[in-house]
Amino acid sequence: MSNLKSLYSKMWIDSIDRFKNNNCDTDLLVNDSKDMRRGITVLSYFNDSVGAKVSNFLEELKIIEPEQYYYPKNELHLTVLSIVSCISGFKLSNIDVEEYSSIFKDSVKEIGGFKVKYKGITVSPSCILIQGFPDNEQLSHLRNFLRTHFNKAKLQSTIDSRYKISTAHTTAVRCTAPFKHCEAIMKVLSTYRDYDFGTLEVNSLELVFNNWYQNLSITKSLSKLDLNSSERYK
């Protein structure tokens, strides 16, 4: 956990001046119907309790800066691993869904449920993130099992091609336009810097086909597993 705290702290130090000085990178493809980037991801959606607290935080920001992109409550999620990073033109018909689902199930059969504590926020040059802290090494083991199984299967994948994921953060806001009220935004960010959003009990995982923003209007569930069910061992 100390490593994660240090990493999140470094992210904050490296990027918070961008928010103070209205110099954030902006994402111009949010809500662009021509954006055809698609991929395959293993994830877990937030429960109502954590989702509600994050949404309350986002509502405070939205009142000040309504032009930014705020993740809807039902789209907040923990990314376990990107199997195929979003590629322009990638289609579900490019893969054998049954093969991917089978590898997914084999990868997680020895993993039980785990918890992620969401406490505090940090920032990147273009986003506001909720800090996540797993309660044990299960998430790390899970990611390594997925990496090993998909690499052995030699199916199309781009695992770790952008970066090797090691955190449990959740993206909550994407900057899509210059800020109009930097000082007010900074006050809210400072208030929530160490805020306790609650604990996510990760009892199920999904393998999904998705776009860059994980919009549910585009997301298709390919396989879902209950981590606490004996049925997954059969």
Label every model-predicted segment.
Residues M1-K234:
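Histidine-dependent nucleotide/RNA phosphoesterase domain, centered on the 2H-phosphoesterase fold
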